[in-house]
Amino acid sequence: MARYENILELEPNLNGEDLSIGIVMSRFNIEASEGLLGACVEELMKQGVDAGNVVLVSVPGALEIPLALQKMALTDQFDALIALGAVIRGETYHFEIVSEQSTNGVSTVQLDTGIPIANGILTTNTDDQALARMSQKGAEAARVAIEMANLQRTLDEMEQ
């Protein structure tokens, strides 16, 4: 649906058929991470991604996610990647460091490699907040990965 006459508007495309998706999940705060993963995988399948085209890697914590994403991106086997995990505030400043560094790392990998990465790393004050948000955020990460992979394909085709 074009909003302006004579302007090409690229519509969001949530068709997951023929896409290869890599997922990196933190095992820290595993209950929230597993909830994110379940919702994410369910949404990927709902949007047509073949289960055989999804690769899951788990890492100890959120700070390890960017390196695993980078290694996956450099294989050139994935159309998009998804980062999943939960950073929950504790009694020390560590929360701020982990939240900031994991987010910066994900963004850096995305920009350095040109592979779209959906950031599904929750940052919450409590366990209850993480558990309340995990289903929505997991599904959202799946849709973001699919949409951005398709947008990248469309833009790549326009370059030719």
UniProtKB/Swiss-Prot annotation:
UniProt cross-references to InterPro entries, sorted A to Z: LS, LS/RS, LS/RS_sf
Catalytic-site annotation from UniProt: 94 (proton donor)
Entry annotated with the keyword Transferase: yes
Residues that hold 5-amino-6-(D-ribitylamino)uracil according to the record: 28, 62-64, 86-88, 119
Any one GO molecular-function label of the UniProt entry: 6,7-dimethyl-8-ribityllumazine synthase activity
One Pfam family hit: DMRL_synthase
Disulfide cross-links: none
Residues engaged in binding (2S)-2-hydroxy-3-oxobutyl phosphate: 91-92, 133
Reaction equation(s) it catalyzes: (2S)-2-hydroxy-3-oxobutyl phosphate + 5-amino-6-(D-ribitylamino)uracil = 6,7-dimethyl-8-(1-D-ribityl)lumazine + phosphate + 2 H2O + H(+)
Protein name from the UniProt record: 6,7-dimethyl-8-ribityllumazine synthase
Natural source organism: Nitrosospira multiformis (strain ATCC 25196 / NCIMB 11849 / C 71)
Lineage of the species this protein comes from: Bacteria, Pseudomonadati, Pseudomonadota, Betaproteobacteria, Nitrosomonadales
